Amino acid sequence: MTSDRPVAPLLTVKQVIPRVRDGAVGRDRLNERLTSATSRLTVVVAPAGWGKTVLLSSWAASLGPDAKVAWLSLDEEDDEPVRFWRYLIGALRTASDGVSAAVLEALMAPGLRPLDLAVPMLLNELAAASARRMSWSSTTST
């Protein structure tokens, strides 16, 4: 399901968790809230310059080297839908074995509305991966 049209490569630096600089202000209470969150998704919202990146990168570092974290840094160039989804899918693939290359291929498929094909595939793969993890954790905890 590959396309013949040329595709710009993804910038892998956008998927690298920024290193926390020495002297960065610690956010122990917020780090604890992130660590103890029970939902599968946490949204962090604050104005520019209020420490979101520092908070999330320090939290990700606190999870240890084996933690799987999908990180994506976006800029104004990433507001084109297919470009955005390519980056998001790429970031999710770094953190989850449950997201296949077929999703990226679907996004670039000729003759179709790519988001109509790729986004449902991605959501189905994430749901299946989540179900497998839940099934595995329930069998290991009994």
Predicted regions and their residues:
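Phosphate-binding P-loop
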Residues: 32-41
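P-loop (Walker A) phosphate-binding loop of NTP-binding proteins
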Residues: 47
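Catalytic acidic motif of RecA-like/P-loop NTPases
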Residues: 127, 139-142
